[in-house]
Amino acid sequence: MVLCFPLLLLLLVLWGPVCPLHAWPKRLTKAHWFEIQHIQPSPLQCNRAMIGINNYTQHCKHQNTFLHDSFQNVAAVCDLLSIVCKNRRHNCHQSSKPVNMTDCRLTSGKYPQCRYSAAAQYKFFIVACDPPQKSDPPYKLVPVHLDSIL
């Protein structure tokens, strides 16, 4: 039985994180996953920037938008007036000013060799916000989903 435990442990490590396309890695809070996916104060080339996201999900994400702003500034949008989200919930908030962002779109490749094109944009955004979890920053609400770009 002693030999089985190391083998089981090895299998768990090699299996790695596997999550569906619509889910976030369960070891992260939704706000932390939002930050990983969408907050990038200084623009990076899409192929490099998407590695971090794709390594969590173990697949090439088809499209992703990076907001070139701080988590603190995006979280401040959660204090603005609530509006209806695409999913009909009432926890969305629109930015009061446009921000620089990069839209990354998958052009070719299979994980881990994902290749992306980039489009720089200067637009408003809408985020869904929820109360923070224990390990989140201590804001009243934190961004958990990028609902749309305007």
Curated annotation (Swiss-Prot):
UniProt keywords (A-Z) are: Antibiotic, Antimicrobial, Disulfide bond, Endonuclease, Glycoprotein, Hydrolase, Lysosome, Nuclease, Secreted, Signal
A Gene Ontology BP annotation from the UniProt entry: defense response to Gram-positive bacterium
Q: Which subcellular locations apply to this protein?
A: Secreted; Lysosome; Cytoplasmic granule
- The reply to whether Disulfide bond figures as a keyword in the UniProt entry is yes
Its job: Ribonuclease which shows a preference for the pyrimidines uridine and cytosine. Has potent antibacterial activity against a range of Gram-positive and Gram-negative bacteria, including P.aeruginosa, A.baumanii, M.luteus, S.aureus, E.faecalis, E.faecium, S.saprophyticus and E.coli. Causes loss of bacterial membrane integrity, and also promotes agglutination of Gram-negative bacteria. Probably contributes to urinary tract sterility. Bactericidal activity is independent of RNase activity.
What PANTHER family has UniProt attached to this entry? RIBONUCLEASE, RIBONUCLEASE K6
Q: What is this protein called?
A: Ribonuclease K6
Q: What gene, per UniProt, encodes this protein? A: RNASE6
